[in-house]
């Protein structure tokens, strides 16, 4: 049986020749698939793909609209200084939210270390974002770089995590859709890839 590495090499060779490689499994871009399979671990290939989309948008600092300095070394670890739960873990835990829904790629944003550790901590989004709104006159545009397209519509000012979760899933779904060349196999339902396991397990802040 041909190894996965050998298969990948053949596919890359096809891409280099401007040919479309074939895959044996379907790719789902639906919001429901993201919600069901987005538990956060920086070692999972599925999560890495979505993190690449986040980074592609050059996320900016909530507080001053400057581009976040993304450290490639830290991005390999789920406890990275760059990873922030937009609805903080401590805040959602107090509301008895399910852990798998708290520690989810849809709740992850890429920020700088100072912002994550000292400015946000366990505050609700409406509280810490109100502070940033006064400091950052471009906050609405800043948040679009995090694929949070509208603070009201995403339930941020109402601290509505369920609404935020749904809305961000829709946006991430659209972003994945833009990058996928649909093939016949994609007509089949996708199941989570069995070997999409984390390389290492860490806790996020």
Predicted features and spans:
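Short conserved micro-motifs at the rims of enzyme active sites and ligand-binding pockets
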Residues: 92-95, 119-126, 154, 184
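Intrinsically disordered, low-complexity N-proximal targeting/linker segments that flank membranes
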Residues: 1-83, 91
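Histidine-centered nuclease catalytic patch
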Residues: 73-107, 124
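A broadly conserved detector of short glycine/acidic/proline-rich loop/turn motifs that flank catalytic sites
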Residues: 57, 87, 92-93, 114-116
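Non-catalytic, well-ordered alpha-helical scaffold segments
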Residues: 48, 106-109, 170
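Charged substrate- and nucleic-acid-binding regions of tRNA-handling and nucleotidyl-transfer enzymes
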Residues: 1-7, 123-158
């Amino acid at each position: 049986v041909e190894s996965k590495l050998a298969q990948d090499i053949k596919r890359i060779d096809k891409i280099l020749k401007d040919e479309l490689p074939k895959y044996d499994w379907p790719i789902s871009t639906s919001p429901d698939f993201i919600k069901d399979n987005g538990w956060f671990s920086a070692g999972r290939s599925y999560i890495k793909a979505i993190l690449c989309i986040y980074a592609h948008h050059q996320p900016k600092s909530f507080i001053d609209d400057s581009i976040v300095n993304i450290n490639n070394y830290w991005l390999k670890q789920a406890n990275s200084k760059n990873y922030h739960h937009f609805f903080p873990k401590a805040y959602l835990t107090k509301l008895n939210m399910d852990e798998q829904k708290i520690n989810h790629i849809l709740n992850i944003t890429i920020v700088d270390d100072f912002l994550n550790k000292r400015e946000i901590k366990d505050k609700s989004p409406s509280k810490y974002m109100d502070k940033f709104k006064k400091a950052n006159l471009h906050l609405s545009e800043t948040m679009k770089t995090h694929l949070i397209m509208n603070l009201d519509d995403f339930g941020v000012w109402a601290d509505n995590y369920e609404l935020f979760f749904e809305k961000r899933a829709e946006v991430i779904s659209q972003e994945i859709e833009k990058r996928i060349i649909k093939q016949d196999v994609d007509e089949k339902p996708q199941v989570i890839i069995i070997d999409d396991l984390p390389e290492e397990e860490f806790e996020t802040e």
